[in-house]
């Protein structure tokens, strides 16, 4: 029977008569490394049979000199190792480094493996299937098991395309893997096991794990380190869950659908010990895997407090990357302050995805009201905590006009930090990918090389792919390309600050909507030869290449040896310009705008404004510790207090955010590491003022 999930499920499984193997009763919450090792050694003493060799893979990309530990595999292994009945299973090192040259070595190591366990994600599917295929060729008897988010629930022709895979694991893998190994030791009738698919059948889903404290920690048992070899020059990233589940059902995401709405938590005692483990083992980066950190406000505050204490005591962890609760409020500010006070947190995410009501209804998402959102960004700004928001282009229900309207609304929030805008990815198990949903909204997608920002080109020898949406009933491909152009302009010229205050000036003085300002910039970039137009040429090629399925990678080795998003690369090219050249380029565009809109601003005002805009940017030319500049007009008063333009010979100064002398490191610090922390510009309200002449004269534009 093929893909029984799409038809009737197996009904003949009699759960009442199912045989269960008795195992040792253990208090996993009190497990330490020493008694875990004693337990394993005791299990080994009971062996009087041949070992079963288990190999595994959880491939990841490197980010700088960092790579993720194989957390998912370690969860399974640490659990299995506590079961006496599985003492004959010998777990080999997990393959994590992705390199085509290493594949043959991995295959050779698996020539005599009995089981291959593969943790599958969108960023490692191709290399994982290549590994499994090659191992099947040299080791036909190996049981190959795939699990992870990339394992599809809707199988279609999966086993025809990947005949070398024996078992697919759906959902949480701990209990399912235990049952697979139990059956492996017996008659190997996998039909008895819930939550799996083979080429012949799919069984009913496995119930969710209710008691997480029955699962030992892969960190406290040191399992996660036992599964890897340390490599000189590399540091480990630790994935970390404090809870599992998501109460939301956004259709573009597989989080809520894959873990259901029930939220389940690990004990605070275990989490605090894991935080201490991170510090003891000098783990620099914690990749938080919660869908909604902060949803348990008091509990999560104590977790944040413990992380802060650990960093102050031991210097590690250095960074905690976390997905914040979708419906945030000022109540999470104390959590964020604990983390930002010691540099653990770079910025708080306040995601919107879309501001269009019809789109939000279509994707089953509810946002904060925008005035509430805006008040929240102001509260964070008052506490000196950076914020950023995320938008998705091309969601079902969105139109070009609604997308532009949403951007106009977001730009009205002057306290919001960065704006990050992404294509709409189509995940295999997200509700958006269900056949009935795709048909209802006329969703078309393409397979394209995966866009993994800040990864090295030399890791792309085995190309990974993703699916992105390129058309729905609410927009066509041409309109989506236009959305991308506006997304790039807003991120490059507004968020990175190249033209931000110029746009606000024209909005204040001429009531020119900011999106109309950027529409004019688009016309200028398309028709006028300038340094700006060179970036627009990059943009057009990038858009055509991306939406034809050839990928979104953008490499400029004058900037960095990594894949930069186009908006980061464009901003970097502007910010490293000689400031006189940048002044001239902005001046040319302003002249074009004035002529196009028939504005007649005074040249002295415009020159001083452009000078002020550039002064606020983190430019490569100026690496001094303190930046200072004299101006004819009081621009701080104008932008911060909405005052009239007044002449006042004034000098502003501020501490330079980036003074790195190495040109490549400078770019990384400004547009990569510094993007969410707003390291690329200074806000007018934070300027220090040294008044030379307190003689203000209200100055008219005309």
Regions found by a protein language model. Give the residues of each.
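Glycine- and acidic-residue-enriched helix-capping/strand-helix junction motifs
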Residues: 62-74
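Conserved C-terminal portion of the radical SAM core fold
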Residues: 115-117, 279-289, 315, 319-323, ...
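Radical SAM [4Fe-4S] cluster-binding motif and immediate context
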Residues: 42, 218-382, 393
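Radical SAM enzyme core and accessory elements
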Residues: 2-59, 64, 86-88, 109, ...
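N-terminal [4Fe-4S]-dependent radical SAM core
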Residues: 5, 18, 23, 28-53, ...
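Short helix-loop-beta junction
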Residues: 75-89
């Amino acid at each position: 029977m093929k893909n029984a999930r799409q038809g009737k499920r197996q009904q003949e499984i009699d759960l009442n008569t199912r045989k269960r193997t008795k195992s040792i009763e253990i208090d996993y919450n009190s497990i330490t490394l020493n008694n875990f090792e004693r337990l394993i050694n005791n299990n080994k003493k009971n062996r009087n049979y041949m070992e079963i060799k288990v190999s595994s893979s959880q491939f990841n990309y490197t980010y700088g000199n960092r790579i993720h530990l194989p957390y998912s595999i370690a969860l399974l292994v640490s659990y299995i190792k506590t079961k006496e009945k599985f003492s004959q299973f010998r777990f080999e090192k997990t393959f994590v480094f992705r390199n085509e040259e290493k594949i043959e070595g991995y295959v050779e190591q698996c020539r005599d493996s009995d089981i291959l366990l593969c943790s599958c994600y969108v960023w490692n599917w191709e290399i994982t299937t290549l590994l499994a295929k090659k191992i099947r060729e040299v080791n036909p008897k190996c049981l190959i098991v795939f699990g992870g988010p990339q394992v599809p629930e809707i199988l279609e022709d999966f086993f025809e395309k990947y005949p070398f895979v024996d078992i697919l694991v759906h959902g949480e893998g701990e209990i399912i893997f235990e049952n697979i190994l139990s059956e492996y030791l017996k008659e190997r009738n996998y039909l008895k096991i819930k939550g799996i698919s083979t080429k012949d059948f799919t069984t009913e889903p496995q119930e969710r794990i209710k008691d997480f404290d029955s699962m030992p920690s892969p960190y406290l048992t040191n399992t996660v380190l036992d599964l890897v070899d340390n490599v000189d020059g590399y540091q480990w990233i630790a994935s970390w869950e404090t809870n599992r589940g998501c109460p939301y059902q956004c259709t573009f995401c597989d989080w809520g659908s894959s873990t259901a709405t029930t939220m389940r938590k690990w004990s605070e005692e275990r989490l605090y010990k894991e935080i201490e483990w991170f510090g003891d083992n000098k783990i620099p980066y914690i990749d938080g895997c919660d869908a909604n950190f902060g949803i348990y406000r008091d509990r999560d505050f104590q977790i944040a407090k413990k992380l802060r204490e650990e960093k102050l005591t031991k210097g590690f962890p250095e960074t905690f990357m976390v997905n914040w609760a979708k419906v945030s409020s000022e109540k999470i500010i104390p959590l964020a302050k604990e983390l930002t006070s010691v540099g653990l947190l770079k910025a708080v995410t306040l995601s919107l995805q879309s501001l269009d009501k019809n789109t939000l209804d279509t994707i089953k998402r509810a946002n904060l009201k925008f005035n509430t959102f805006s008040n929240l960004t102001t509260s964070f700004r008052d506490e000196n905590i950076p914020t950023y928001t995320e938008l998705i282009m091309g969601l079902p229900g969105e139109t070009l006009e609604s997308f532009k309207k949403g951007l106009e609304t977001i730009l009205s929030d002057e306290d919001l930090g960065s704006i990050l805008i992404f294509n709409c990815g189509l995940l295999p198990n997200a509700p958006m990918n269900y056949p009935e949903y795709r048909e209802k909204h006329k969703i078309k997608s393409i397979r394209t090389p995966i866009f993994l920002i800040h990864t090295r080109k030399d890791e792309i020898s085995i190309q990974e792919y993703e699916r992105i949406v390129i058309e729905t009933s609410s927009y066509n491909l041409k309109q989506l390309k236009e959305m991308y152009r506006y997304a790039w302009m807003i991120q490059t010229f507004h968020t990175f600050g190249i033209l931000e205050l110029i746009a606000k000036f024209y909005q204040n003085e001429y009531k020119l909507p900011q999106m109309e300002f950027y529409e004019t910039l688009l016309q200028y970039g398309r028709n006028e030869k300038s340094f700006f137009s060179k970036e627009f040429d990059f943009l057009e090629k990038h858009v055509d290449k991306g939406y034809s399925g050839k990928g979104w990678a953008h490499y400029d080795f004058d900037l960095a040896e990594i894949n930069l998003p186009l908006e980061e690369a464009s901003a970097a090219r502007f910010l490293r310009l000689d400031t006189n050249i940048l002044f001239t380029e902005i001046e040319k565009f302003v002249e074009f705008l004035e002529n196009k809109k028939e504005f007649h601003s005074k040249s002295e005002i415009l020159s001083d404004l452009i000078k002020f805009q550039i002064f606020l940017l983190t430019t490569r030319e100026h690496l001094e510790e303190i930046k200072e500049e004299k101006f004819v007009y009081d621009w701080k008063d104008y932008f911060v207090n909405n005052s009239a333009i007044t002449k006042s010979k004034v000098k502003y100064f501020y501490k330079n955010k980036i003074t790195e002398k190495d040109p490549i490191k400078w770019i990384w610090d400004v547009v990569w590491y510094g993007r969410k922390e707003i390291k690329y510009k200074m806000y007018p309200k934070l300027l220090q003022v040294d008044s030379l002449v307190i003689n203000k004269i209200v100055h008219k534009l005309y």
